[in-house]
Amino acid sequence: MPQLRDSGTRSLHATEPVPSAEMDGFCRIFGVETEYGVAVTGAERPVDAGQVAMTMFQPIVSRSRSTNTYLANGSRLYLDVGSHPEYATAEARDPREALGQDLAGEHVMRNLALKAQRKLRESYSEHATIHVFKNNVDSAGHAFGCHENYLVRRFVPLETIEHQLLPFLITRQLYTGAGRMTPDGFQITQRADFLDEAVSSATTRSRPMVNTRDEPHADPDSFRRLHVIIGDSNRSQWSTWMKLAVTHLVLCAIEDAFRLGTPSGFEHCAFADPAAANRTVSRFLDDPHAELTLESGESVSALGLQRRYYAAVKAFIETHGDALASSLPATTIVTIMGEWSRVLDALERGAYDALADRVDWAAKKRLFDALKRRRPDVTFAQMEQLELDYHDIANGRLYGSLTSRNQMRELLTGDDVEYAVHNPPTDTRAALRGRFVDAALNVGAQFSADWTHLTLTAPERREAILLDPFEAEPTPEFEQLMEAL
């Protein structure tokens, strides 16, 4: 049975790691970690959220003897602190592949919830209903996260991430925010009021926008894993894909600037107060032209700063187009830039309804506005319930209704998602992890796994180390591990 262990990358290997062949290019590894909220309605007596989560994970515990496991598609499934089930996608080379893996996580969580619901109904009422929320704030005001992971070349200093990337991450929420109804009005993000630091290595005693804890899950001399905490959980497929795609292009420009010792174009974008800027961006609809103060003393609107990033990336593409194109197997640079340009133009015009088929906050705003027109006496509590239904991946109806009526863009089909549930990406080390986990489960072997280690613990101990996340070809030690199965 599998056991989970944490991987401390710097002590992984007895010999010096072989530098990745991708170190000199623009290829990247993408990943998304999503914490889900759980609740039960319709029960005859209260059901603790922690009990619900444990009931959901009972099949996992029965199979793996743990609430932490890796799946045959290369992903990690585990029960996080408290009652939040979490799914971390397998390593992907393309935002589209990462999107498919993220949607596979929704599928897995939904199935776990519906199985647990049948069990709960035996004890708590035939009407007991489990809700699994892909959002970031619960009704008690507790925040939980959606974290993006990007493999970044280590020669880029953390100070540069804070000063050149963070302003982009804050203002990209104009089109990636999930939106939230609050007693004080509608915000375009979910977590702005909960993030209090720009960068930090802690995530418990503080709530940073970017986590700097050094766990690259790769050669630590070549790469760091950028752990982005600012960002909402998205139902919109377009938003999940878009936030990964545009962030990749900005990171490419930053990396190339440090590689060559040239300006990136983002040197003067740092905010004087990132947390204050984040809160202002979240209230974009209150004042779309609100000015944000930069460290230089200059003031600029969120949209104005996004246009600066867009212009700098466009100029970068003109001289690096071929190299950038080869960095993404399934997404074209033309598509990313076209979508970016169109969304900025729509925001400039105030044409928020034009974004309602792809941007979560715009979709929710359209729904709330229509509801208030039909029912002027609608209460905040009723709108809050509608919002929760939008985020409920287990028993919610609203988002599914939007997609079935083509009011929300879908980039992947149901077959694409079903494939991602059972299969890892074929061009990263996730392919090897998935192959090992699938084989070990099929024969009932005792094994352990993490992002960089695969270990057979009985009847004989064998181990394979997968330090290069880009490498999908079996190593001799991996082949020996598989033969031992």
UniProtKB/Swiss-Prot annotation:
Annotated metabolic or biological route of this protein: Protein degradation; proteasomal Pup-dependent pathway; Protein modification; protein pupylation
InterPro entries: Pup_ligase (IPR022279), Pup_ligase/deamidase (IPR004347)
GO biological process per UniProt: modification-dependent protein catabolic process; proteasomal protein catabolic process; protein pupylation
Residues holding Mg(2+): E33, Y78, E86
Residues spanning the membrane: none
Keyword Kinase tagged: no
Catalysed reactions listed for this entry: ATP + [prokaryotic ubiquitin-like protein]-L-glutamate + [protein]-L-lysine = ADP + phosphate + N(6)-([prokaryotic ubiquitin-like protein]-gamma-L-glutamyl)-[protein]-L-lysine
EC assignment: 6.3.1.19
Binding site for ATP: R76, T89, W451
Keywords tagged on the record: ATP-binding, Ligase, Magnesium, Metal-binding, Nucleotide-binding, Ubl conjugation pathway
UniProt GO MF annotations: ATP binding; ligase activity, forming carbon-nitrogen bonds; magnesium ion binding; ubiquitin-like protein transferase activity
Active site annotation, chain numbering: D80
Misc note: The reaction mechanism probably proceeds via the activation of Pup by phosphorylation of its C-terminal glutamate, which is then subject to nucleophilic attack by the substrate lysine, resulting in an isopeptide bond and the release of phosphate as a good leaving group.
PANTHER family named in the record: PUP DEAMIDASE/DEPUPYLASE (PTHR42307), PUP--PROTEIN LIGASE (PTHR42307:SF3)
Family designation: Belongs to the Pup ligase/Pup deamidase family. Pup-conjugating enzyme subfamily.
UniProt-recorded name of the protein: Pup--protein ligase
Species this protein is from: Bifidobacterium longum subsp. infantis (strain ATCC 15697 / DSM 20088 / JCM 1222 / NCTC 11817 / S12)
